[in-house]
Amino acid sequence: MAKGQSLQDPFLNALRRERVPVSIYLVNGIKLQGQIESFDQFVILLKNTVSQMVYKHAISTVVPSRPVSHHSNTPSGGTSNYHHGNNPSAPQQPQQESDDAE
């Protein structure tokens, strides 16, 4: 397994196993929605009313509809910062703040 996929594979696998609905944003801005049916090194098979093969190089962001728990294969059972919400660069659901702060 490539080092760059040590986070990607467990994350996608958790989404697939738990059948979590996801929004996948492509680099051209298009939003796709569905459940991850399967994936490999290059593509994700996204199922909604039809199955779509989405090339990973075209994906900008994968946003689960709910938090998922995914653990790496490290002895400590390390987790990513994504589902803890303490990584400011991680994709998150947009939250609207009131305009009173200005």
From Swiss-Prot:
It comes from the Bacteria. Residues 70-96 have a biased composition (Polar residues). InterPro entries: Hfq (IPR005001), LSM_dom_sf (IPR010920), Sm (IPR047575). One of its GO terms (molecular function) is RNA binding. Residues 64-102 are annotated as: Disordered. The keyword RNA-binding applies. SUPFAM superfamilies: Sm-like ribonucleoproteins. Keywords: RNA-binding, Stress response. GO terms for cellular component: cytosol. Residues 9-68 form the Sm domain. One of its GO terms (biological process) is regulation of DNA-templated transcription. The keyword Hydrolase does not apply. Pfam families: Hfq. Homohexamer. RNA chaperone that binds small regulatory RNA (sRNAs) and mRNAs to facilitate mRNA translational regulation in response to envelope stress, environmental stress and changes in metabolite concentrations. Also binds with high specificity to tRNAs. Belongs to the Hfq family. HAMAP family: Hfq. This is RNA-binding protein Hfq. It comes from Serratia proteamaculans (strain 568). The lineage of its organism: Bacteria, Pseudomonadati, Pseudomonadota, Gammaproteobacteria, Enterobacterales.
